[in-house]
């Protein structure tokens, strides 16, 4: 089984207590993107990243000085969003790290796909960024089926804990032989499941931690997830969508 998650916009390099074990599989493609981003004028980069001047300035400097083969941090410790805070890899036990290195993959607009212990540097480039160059129409076009092929080399089961922005990179390439399951985390209101961004991110992080703690290898075991008030709802789910409803919000 492979579990896919999204990256986070915010990054840090404070994971010095663990070292990278690998280089990203598509490092050369990341270098090509870096060269292009490095060539952009500041204002053009700011528009591409859709951010304020402070963040644009930080990332303009990053791309100008970036050394993708130099000092790096393990990807799982480099991202600093809500999902990663609730996953809390900083306090993982060794066997949890072994589990996620085998089963977890982080999708990235810049690196394509990452193992947890791939060495990365801070960057900002969302998959949906309107990057149009002489070699691609956008990042979905740039990555084509690269991410999907890497993801399905060894496994035919994919658990989707990523946002639509990132899961879109593989969904168009799915074949009949792939068991693809999406997790939905929401509140039940008037018979409909309503997802709230913050709660979804929290639950995705908790789900990864839950799976690592239990060393889950079978999809059926995922249904036992019961953290943050979420419970699996059989009647709302099907073979390709596992729905978890926040119990306290049911009406």
Swiss-Prot record:
Organism (species): Desulfitobacterium hafniense (strain Y51)
Alphabetized InterPro entries for the sequence: YaaA (IPR005583)
Could you identify this protein by its name? Answer: UPF0246 protein DSY0297
Span-the-membrane segments of this chain are none
Family, as annotated: Belongs to the UPF0246 family.
The record's listing under PANTHER family reads: PEROXIDE STRESS RESISTANCE PROTEIN YAAA (PTHR30283:SF4), PEROXIDE STRESS RESPONSE PROTEIN YAAA (PTHR30283)
Supply one GO BP term. Answer: response to hydroperoxide
Q: Which GO terms describe its cellular component?
A: cytosol
